[in-house]
Structure formats: structure tokens, C-alpha cells
Amino acid sequence: MTSVFHVYFGPEALTATPRVRHIGPDDCFSALKEGLDDFFAMPTYPIFVGLFYAVAGIALFAMTSFGNAMHLAFPLAAGFVLIGPFVAIGLYEMSRRRERGLAVASSDTLTVLRSPALPSILAFGLLLLAIFAAWIFAAELIYVWLYGPNPPAAAIPFLQDVLSTGRGWTLIVVGVLVGFCFAALALAISVVSFPLMLDRDLGLVPALDASLRVTRANPLAVALWGLIVAAALVLGSLPLFFGLAVVLPVLGHATWRFYRKAIERDPAHEVPIEGPLHPDVTKNPALRLVWIFLDALDYLRQGREPTDLNASSGEPKSRATKPRAGAP
């Protein structure tokens, strides 16, 4: 059973503090390019995840448009920035395997369930979720402060009011400024936290500290990275959120590459790559269904034989782990 100490600080034996590199704008754009390379090399799972969030974005817009919650459409959409680093944990695992020259299957993303840092990752995810909830609460307070108990009841009158009145523009300006503060906080504490926890089994506190040290050492690069993420999300949201099907996975892979540039590697403390999931895990009906679906997508894309989850031993047959073509 994982101790509370492990969740917050990592293994007691771990004494190496992650060393921060100095990076610049070129590193940000290089990380984005490498993220694109990862996406095109491994498109199946990212497209599946991206489409899920595109649909989620449309659903959020619909829920806020046909009720008395249109004013929360922007804060909810901005939540992608706040919780995105946690959601992309499976994409980090794919990029981690690819950089080591391993063949990557979509179902390999489920091996994060066996990561020794999983409790710390979940705890950090809850922290980001709390920041997101605080942002939504602040947005509601700003709206009530400006519009009182009788706001426009429908979406069209609300949009007309926002774009043509003083209180509407005040809502936009104040809302954007407050949202920027929440986004800056989330970026500063999580810019490399999740990849670092996955890679080295660090606890919540040292991972948060490492992100803050990266931010202090490279304020311009981190600010540029945040701007790239925000701009990409805005562009991805414009065509009815469908652009997020590409933007979110690319940003997930690029975040892993950014982490590699911002933190020096320490092979002695890196967590070994996991093999196939234990049969007890794949016997879980929900996980088994996800496994089969992801494996089927790989079969359709690559033409390889799907993983056999019904082997007599109960253990999924291991795929031969082959280096990528051109891998060192």
C-alpha cells in the first residue's frame, strides 16, 4: 500500500534532485516540432483521445448555450489548459517509449496504471481540478457582480449584451485577467510535473518544486510555452472544437519533449519501461474493453495481429518489442 509520504514526497531512498536546464524559445518550437513527429508516428490513440475531448467541448458548449449558464462557456473551455497536463499522461508514456526506440502500441498507454507514481499523479490531478473549480467559482462571482440576479436568459441576448455594453466588456476584460492568473498558476506548478513523476517516480511536492524551478530559471521560455499552448487551443476550438482532435494530442506529446529539454536526464533514477499489463488488470471489464478497442485500432492501422487476451495463462501475449526503424 502506498504511504502518504510516498504520494507527497516519493520514495524515501530517492535523494537526487532533478537538475534544471536553461532553455530558450528555440527549445519551445523544437519541442512542438518533435510533438508533431510523435503524433504522426503514433496517430491512433491520440486521435481517439482528441476526438473524445472535441466531443466533450461541443457538449460543454451545448450545455451552457441552452441553459442559464452561457457565461460559463469560456471558463469551462479554459479548463482544458488547467487540467490538460493530467489528461495527457498516456501520451507522455507513448512518447517515452518512442524516444527509447521501442515499438509503441496504443494499449501500451494503459501501463501507466502500474506506474509507482500513479497515486502521486492522481493527487496532483486533484490539485489541478481544485484550481479549475476555483476558476469556475471566480467566474460565477464576476458574472453575478456585473449582471446581478436578472441576467439575459438566452444565449443570443447574452452575447449581444457582452459585445455591446460596458458591463459586457468589463466581464470580458476582468474574466480574461482572472483566468490568466489561474492559468499562469497551473502552468508554473505543472509545466514538467506529470512527465517527471511518470519518468522518475517523484512525489507531488518535489515534482511541483521542479516545475517552479524550471519556471524561475526560464521565465521567458515557460511564458512562450504557455502562449503556444493557449494559441493552439484557441485555434483548435474555433471549428466547433473539432480541431482539438489534433491539437490536444500534439500538445501532449510536445509537453513530454519540453520536459526532456527543461530537465537533465538521470538514467539511474528513471523508472523502467513496463511490459504488458498483469492479467488481473486486463480482466477488469472496463479496462479490457478499452484494451481491445485500442488494440483493434492498431490492427486496422498497421495490419498486425491483435493482442491475445484469452491465452491459457491469462497473460496477454507479449508483442515483440522491436526498435523503431532508424532508432539508435
Over which residues does each language-model region extend?
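Hydrophobic alpha-helical membrane segments
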Residues: 1-328
